[in-house]
């Protein structure tokens, strides 16, 4: 059964992101730029002026919303000057850059997100109901929807890696972090 290994992999990935962020969030960057300032600098470096940066509640709830042209940074990232926060903010700005330059894979990903979100939310419900009712068809549909959500994550890995590459290149080009601090900024890669 592929469901349990896929769930374990997802859990381990989330734990890795959280522990990596925790480790590097305690290390203040020497230049003192916050996550919000880093995102703004990356956008400016690419000539992007129509994207807003907002604070959102939560922890590691950071994302770029292409529908409203807003980078939303969590409390742990927005005002923090750690290399991890700068890296996460730059990664999200990297997604805004992808849209600005017309990066094809991000457009495909955006088209698939609503469908995969619905499937992901329904999958576990259908699996549980299928198990409770001994219904193979419901269970099977739930597993199929979950597998589709996992496959979607795999398909979007190139988009995430590209955003991280853009983020690190921008951080190097804008000198927001010292060279030895870039390792902590690569949380965006773990964020994948």
PLM region spans:
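Hydrophobic alpha-helical transmembrane segments of small proteolipidic membrane proteins, enriched
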Residues: 1-20, 130, 136-143, 149-153, ...
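Post-HExxH zinc-binding segment in Zn-dependent metallohydrolases
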Residues: 113-136
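Polar-ligand-bearing catalytic/cofactor-coordination segments
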Residues: 15-119, 151-189
């Amino acid at each position: 059964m592929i469901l349990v290994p896929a769930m374990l992999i997802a859990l381990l990935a989330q734990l890795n992101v959280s522990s990596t962020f925790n480790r590097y969030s305690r290390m203040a960057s020497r230049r003192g730029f916050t996550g919000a300032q880093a995102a703004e600098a990356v956008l400016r470096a690419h000539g992007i002026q129509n994207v807003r940066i907002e604070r959102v509640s939560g922890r590691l709830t950071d994302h770029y919303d292409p529908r409203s042209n807003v980078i939303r940074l969590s409390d742990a990232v927005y005002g923090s000057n750690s290399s991890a926060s700068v890296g996460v903010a730059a990664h999200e700005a990297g997604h805004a850059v992808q849209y600005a330059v017309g990066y094809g894979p991000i457009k495909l990903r955006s088209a698939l997100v609503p469908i995969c979100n619905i499937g992901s939310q329904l999958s576990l419900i259908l699996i549980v109901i299928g198990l409770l009712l001994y219904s193979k068809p419901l269970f099977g549909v739930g597993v199929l929807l979950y597998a589709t959500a996992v496959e979607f994550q795999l398909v979007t890995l190139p988009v995430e890696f590209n955003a991280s590459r853009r983020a690190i290149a921008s951080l190097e080009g804008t000198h927001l972090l010292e060279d030895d601090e870039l390792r902590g900024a690569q949380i965006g890669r773990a964020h994948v």
